UniProtKB/Swiss-Prot annotation:
UniProt keyword annotation of Transport present: no
GO terms assigned for molecular function: DNA binding; RNA polymerase binding
PANTHER family assigned to the protein according to its UniProt record, in alphabetical order: TRANSCRIPTION ELONGATION FACTOR GREA
Domain of life: Bacteria
Entries under InterPro entries matching the protein: GreA/GreB_C_sf (IPR036953), TF_GreA/GreB_CS (IPR018151), Tscrpt_elong_fac_GreA (IPR006359), Tscrpt_elong_fac_GreA/B (IPR028624), Tscrpt_elong_fac_GreA/B_C (IPR001437), Tscrpt_elong_fac_GreA/B_fam (IPR023459), Tscrpt_elong_fac_GreA/B_N (IPR022691), Tscrpt_elong_fac_GreA/B_N_sf (IPR036805)
Protein name per Swiss-Prot or TrEMBL: Transcription elongation factor GreA
Gene designation per UniProt: greA
Cited NCBIfam families: greA, PRK00226.1-2, PRK00226.1-4, PRK00226.1-5
Record PROSITE patterns: GREAB_1, GREAB_2
One BP annotation, GO: DNA-templated transcription elongation
Organism (species): Agrobacterium fabrum (strain C58 / ATCC 33970) (Agrobacterium tumefaciens (strain C58))
Keywords: DNA-binding, Transcription, Transcription regulation
Record-stated family: Belongs to the GreA/GreB family.
Primary role: Necessary for efficient RNA polymerase transcription elongation past template-encoded arresting sites. The arresting sites in DNA have the property of trapping a certain fraction of elongating RNA polymerases that pass through, resulting in locked ternary complexes. Cleavage of the nascent transcript by cleavage factors such as GreA or GreB allows the resumption of elongation from the new 3'terminus. GreA releases sequences of 2 to 3 nucleotides.
Amino acid sequence: MVEKVPMTQGGFVKLQEELRFRQQEERPRIIEAIAEARAHGDLSENAEYHAAKEAQSHNEGRITELEDLTARAEVIDLSKMSGSKIKFGATVKLIDEDSDEEKTYQIVGDQEADVKAGRISISSPIARALIGKEVGDSIEVNAPGGAKGYEILAVQWG
């Protein structure tokens, strides 16, 4: 059975845009660079040719990965999400029980995660600790610097 990859609509659109860019813009540019480098003669010591071939390999690998991800995508409609329990797509406001620092995170798919933008992967330790919890609950997360405790202040959808 094919394993579905949960993601938001925004994350799915970004993957589609990257796939289109790599297939329709990057691929032709690299093919042109290979042809140009090939025209310079001896391929054994042609750094431009080898760099272009390496770029082609990287680009084609990413295209294959993106095609697989978009085919297996399970787009979750956040506008239809509700409830008090935390699950995929929830935006959660937490307070660090040690420093009283407030943090807000949205739980998203692995491909969409960007901690600096407040989006954490559903498979991250903090998201796994949050799933199924509600406002007022406390969680403990084993972080690289030791265990950290958080209290859940709010859960929002959409």
